[in-house]
From Swiss-Prot:
Keywords: Cytoplasm, NAD, Oxidoreductase, Tricarboxylic acid cycle
Name of protein: Malate dehydrogenase, cytoplasmic
Organism field: Taenia solium (Pork tapeworm)
SUPFAM superfamilies found in the cross-reference section: LDH C-terminal domain-like (SSF56327), NAD(P)-binding Rossmann-fold domains (SSF51735)
Pfam family for this entry, one: Ldh_1_N
pH-related activity note: Optimum pH is 7.6 for oxaloacetate reduction and 9.6 for malate oxidation. Stable between pH 6.8-8.5 for the forward reaction.
One GO cellular component term noted in the UniProt record for this chain: cytoplasm
């Protein structure tokens, strides 16, 4: 049996982490044969809540959970970690857009990037969840320069899963029968959810999703804004941001990054853009369709896009460049 993995969850006293820590500790992410040591980081003001989270994890008597390190100290949190699930950030509240969070969160991710650089394993895999996730991921990577930019990703699997559900519901199949939707760009209401290449298994056969749907108006006026604004819709109803669905998406994205994607299937993941794919700008974290093998992702190239799609692609790309400039200017 391999040695234990040290897995950091930040914002560990929060609602996403409350769901996520249980999913990781019960073996959903790395399997039932992989021992885990959970590093749980939150601010000192959350100390008593975090103690309660630790008690619950202990009381679950998970067989793969070998140890728990609750802390508000960056050194203790980041030392020798194999995986970082960066959930903690200033929360988004009703009426706020992710851009509004930039000034509050860039300093958090600068400090945590420096801690990652100083204390974590150089092979660490980092998944940034706290919003605005793509730009927080970029800031963190810039302050951990010895860790490859390919080792950082931002969460776009929640949007991917939302898109899959909408397609499945429209054509009347379970979600598992839909694959190869794409989320392009930012995790924001300017993302481009794309079903042009999605495939649906129905009646024992595979069909292009667009053929089964056969309703361009629905794609443009229902599906696209629904996925773009789903997070805000959840906040409007719960008065809190998505928690269980976000935790499930974190597990999905890291699981596929760790173990690989299925043959003939891609997933959406926000990865470092070198400017080589689809004309996306350099030096941002941009959601692309990717395949993954042996822990390494590869962007799926050659997918066609119509003029309407190209327009949405440009909007989300421009937003990410704008976010980057705002974030970097706060350090000047």
């Amino acid at each position: 049996m391999p040695g234990p993995l040290r897995v950091l969850i930040t914002g560990a006293a929060g609602q996403i982490a409350y769901n996520l820590s249980n999913m990781v500790a019960n073996g959903n992410l790395f399997g039932k044969d992989q021992k885990i040591i959970l590093h749980l980081l939150d601010i000192p003001e959350a100390k008593t809540v975090l103690e309660g989270v630790v008690m619950e994890l202990q009381d679950c008597a998970f067989t793969v959970l070998e140890g728990i390190v609750p802390t508000h100290c960056l050194k203790e949190a980041f030392t020798d970690i194999d995986v970082a699930l960066m959930v903690g950030a200033m929360p988004r509240k009703q009426g706020m857009e992710r851009r509004d969070l930039l000034s509050s969160n860039v300093k958090i991710f600068k400090d945590q990037g420096e801690a990652l650089e100083k204390y974590a394993k150089k092979t660490v895999k980092v998944l940034v969840v706290g919003n605005p996730a793509n730009t927080n991921c970029l800031i963190m990577s810039k302050y951990a320069p010895s860790i490859p930019k390919e080792n950082f990703t931002a969460l776009s699997r929640l949007d991917h899963n939302r898109a899959i559900y909408q397609v499945a519901a429209k054509v009347g199949v379970p979600s598992e029968c839909v694959k190869n939707v794409c989320i392009w760009g930012n995790h924001s209401n300017k993302q481009f959810p794309d079903l042009a290449h999605a495939v649906v298994t129905k009646g024992g056969k595979q069909h292009p999703a667009k053929e089964l749907i056969n309703d361009e108006k629905w794609v443009k006026e229902v599906f696209t804004p629904c996925v773009q604004n789903r997070g805000a819709a959840v906040i409007g109803l719960r008065k809190l941001s998505s928690a269980a669905s976000a935790a499930k998406a974190i597990v999905d994205q890291m699981h596929d990054w760790w173990f690989g994607t299925k043959e003939g299937e891609w997933v959406s993941m926000s990865v470092y853009s070198t400017g080589e794919h689809y004309g996306a700008p350099k030096d941002i974290y941009f959601s692309f369709p990717v395949t993954i093998k042996n822990g390494h992702y590869k962007v799926v190239d050659g997918l066609a896009m119509d003029e309407w799609g190209k327009g949405l692609f440009k909007i989300t790309a421009d937003e990410l460049v704008d976010e980057r400039e705002v974030a970097l200017s706060s350090f000047k």
